[in-house]
């Protein structure tokens, strides 16, 4: 009589249940033949778009208020410890290359998960099985230049039986939800002129709106809106105004620098159908670090902007940084909410910025809800600096000055405080140009009034005063100076901010940058990813960590949650990120309570890799190869070495280790063809059995 291990019994049960399900379905469809297609995706109403998501997640922000809040509470603080994987699907290796980053938040509707990779490939995945239903392959031109901040895509939009995507090459495309075929496509902007699309489009009222990245490439920022049915262009709003438009007077009148003045829109706008307004924040003006070329406040750069959702006409703006010379753009998505302030219900808006502040405004007219003071700041006439800057009342969620000067850099000026000017001699300043709150989305709980912000604490060295050509050279950047993060002084900050006071409720400091974004739920949980591959669930009230799961690649995108067949699920896309230095992957995970997969090591037999057996591998030979080829980067004992490789203490999944040795990831080279199959297995055996067991 054979005795099955618990592990084998688990997979035997899965196989038998799937076979039973298959034959029952086959018999049913033999008797009652029907065609199987995904359910229709409607032209969503305004009420559907602003509702808190329950049985679906139909917009990038959960709703068009961009709150990323779920009213579901089946998964909660009491049972989250039992949260386990249901399945993990590989997305055909898409987006694993060194240049790509996985930042997309999945969409879910009627049993189908829609996700896009850093290669702009789209996958429709069956929630019941994890099977890929269809794939759209973008086949991007490999020679695209001028992409800022990695080849990435932050999500898709759905509506009217279509899946909408923006691509790095400047195309806006509508796909058939049944098969991924192109319904229509438009060349919204030209990548050769510095434009790209990295954000998820927004579907609303039969329209699709998208912004454009490229603020370092000499673009003229804008958002464009199209007819969702036909792709017809409806209107454009320029974030750097043309002559005769509101705000053009804040640019030099004797120069065409405004045509290359930046102010990109990095993220998906928010939408309030009752006020008939769209809201978004903008990036820095260009050239970034040479202010004398663009004297004036430079509207609408580094601003929050509201426009008419029907016509695109200007409604109001609030500029966070006047005449920005620090690259303090505002890529974090705008969040809308209604909140009680001093006994009065107000229609609010919040945006967490690179400056380290949350800007809280009345979304009807752009006036501050909490208070924002204009204060004098240090001056440098060579930079044509603004006389004052806005200072929100409340707490900064990251430090805004340098406590101790870093070794090897010039003496601090003004203690490296925010808004310290610089010129050709350069200086160190906090926050960094890529500190504070970057693109990773914030989440908001409407019941508590708490905004959860994912941020980075770091300092940068700024140098300005370099002239730029007008028009800019197409093959170069339009910076007007130099910048660089000061190494070894980087940490992550995850903060809970009270929107009635703009004060910190609680705060966590991480050893690495926070680069994923979050969602928050009525179950008292806030989910946020980590660069080392962990998906974590925190107590929304205290910030305590209640659960974590190793996903096998950098967890650098927000997760999605929904109810399906009376059960709450969470879907996570773990693909790594070049800027975060995290491991690359193509892993799409589904989780629920008692899902069955308690650890990634249980996936060995389902990984899709070729069959392997490490039992006869030569670990001594693996040790020898590791010492000569791997230890410099990963450390003699797998603790992480001078070459910047990750620590290997958690590398216990043989299939995963073999895949990484064979194919490489990030800066790690591929050893397929360099090492024989037996040598790869020897190294994998040594890593998983010796190093990972420490």
Protein language model features and the residues they cover:
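Blade-level signature of beta-propeller repeat domains, shared across WD40, Kelch, NHL, RCC1
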Residues: 560-604
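Blade/loop signatures of beta-propeller domains
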Residues: 42-86, 242-246, 409-422
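Gly/Gly-Pro-rich "capping" loops immediately C-terminal to redox-active cysteine motifs
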Residues: 623, 635-674
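Repeat-blade elements of multi-bladed beta-propeller folds
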Residues: 57-61, 99-121, 146-171, 196-217, ...
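C-terminal capping alpha-helices of c-type cytochrome domains
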Residues: 166, 661, 673-694
């Amino acid at each position: 009589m054979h005795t099955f291990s618990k592990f084998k019994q688990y997979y035997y049960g899965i196989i038998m249940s799937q076979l039973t399900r298959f034959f029952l379905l086959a018999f049913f469809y033999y008797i009652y033949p029907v065609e199987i297609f995904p359910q229709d995706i409607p032209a969503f109403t305004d009420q559907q778009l602003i509702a808190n998501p329950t049985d679906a997640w139909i917009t990038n922000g959960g709703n068009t208020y961009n709150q990323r809040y779920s009213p579901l509470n089946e998964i909660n603080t009491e049972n989250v410890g039992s949260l386990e994987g249901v399945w993990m699907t590989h997305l055909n290796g898409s987006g694993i290359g060194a240049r790509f980053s996985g930042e997309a938040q999945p969409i879910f509707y009627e049993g189908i998960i829609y996700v896009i990779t850093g290669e702009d490939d789209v996958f429709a995945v069956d929630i019941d099985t994890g099977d890929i239903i269809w794939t759209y392959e973008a086949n991007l031109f490999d020679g695209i230049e001028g992409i800022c901040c990695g080849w990435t895509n932050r999500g898709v939009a759905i509506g009217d039986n279509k899946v909408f995507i923006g691509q790095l090459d400047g195309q806006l495309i509508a796909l058939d939800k049944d098969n991924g075929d192109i319904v229509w496509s438009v060349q919204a902007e030209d990548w050769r002129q510095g434009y790209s699309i990295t954000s998820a489009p927004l579907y609303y009222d039969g329209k699709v709106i998208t912004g454009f990245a490229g603020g370092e490439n000499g673009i003229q920022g804008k958002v464009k809106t199209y007819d969702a049915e036909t792709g017809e262009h409806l209107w454009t709003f320029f974030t750097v105004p043309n002559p005769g438009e509101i705000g053009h007077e804040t640019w030099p009148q004797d120069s065409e620098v405004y045509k290359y003045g930046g102010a990109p829109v990095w993220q998906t706008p928010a939408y309030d159908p009752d006020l008939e307004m769209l809201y978004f924040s903008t990036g820095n003006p260009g050239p970034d670090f040479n202010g004398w070329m663009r004297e004036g406040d430079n509207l609408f750069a580094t601003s929050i902007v509201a426009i008419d959702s029907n016509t695109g006409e200007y409604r109001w703006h609030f500029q966070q940084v006047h005449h920005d010379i620090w690259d303090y753009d505002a890529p974090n998505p705008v969040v809308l909410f209604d909140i009680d302030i001093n006994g009065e219900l107000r229609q609010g808006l919040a945006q967490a910025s690179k400056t380290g502040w949350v800007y809280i405004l009345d979304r009807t007219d752009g006036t501050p809800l909490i208070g924002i003071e204009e204060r004098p700041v240090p001056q440098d006439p060579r930079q044509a600096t603004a006389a004052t800057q806005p200072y929100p009342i409340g707490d900064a969620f990251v430090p805004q000055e340098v406590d101790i000067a870093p070794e090897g850099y010039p003496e601090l000026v003004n203690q490296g405080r925010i808004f310290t000017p610089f010129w050709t001699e350069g200086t160190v300043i906090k926050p960094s140009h890529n500190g504070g709150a970057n693109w990773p989305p914030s989440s908001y709980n409407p019941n508590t009034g708490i905004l959860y912000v994912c941020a980075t604490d770091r300092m940068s060295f700024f140098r300005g005063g370099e002239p730029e050509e007008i028009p800019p050279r197409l093959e170069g950047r339009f910076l007007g100076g130099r910048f660089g993060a000061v190494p070894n002084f980087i940490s992550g900050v995850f903060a809970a901010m009270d929107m009635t006071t703009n004060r910190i409720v609680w705060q966590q400091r991480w050893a690495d940058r926070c680069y994923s974004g979050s969602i928050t739920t009525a179950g008292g949980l806030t989910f946020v990813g980590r660069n080392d591959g962990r998906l974590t669930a925190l107590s929304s009230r205290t910030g305590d960590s209640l659960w974590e799961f190793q996903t096998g690649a950098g967890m650098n995108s927000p997760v999605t949650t929904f109810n399906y067949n009376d059960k709450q699920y969470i879907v996570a896309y773990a693909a790594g990120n070049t800027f975060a230095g995290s491991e690359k992957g193509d892993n799409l995970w589904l989780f629920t309570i008692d899902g069955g997969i308690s650890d990634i090591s249980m996936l060995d037999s389902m990984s899709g890799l070729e069959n392997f057996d490490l039992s006869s591998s030569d670990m001594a030979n693996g040790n020898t190869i590791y010492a000569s080829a791997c230890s410099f980067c990963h450390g003699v004992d797998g603790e992480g070495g001078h070459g910047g490789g990750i620590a290997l203490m958690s590398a216990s999944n043989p299939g995963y280790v073999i895949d990484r040795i064979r194919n490489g990831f990030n800066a790690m080279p591929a050893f397929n063809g360099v090492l024989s199959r037996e040598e790869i297995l020897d190294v994998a055996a040594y890593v998983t059995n010796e190093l990972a067991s420490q």
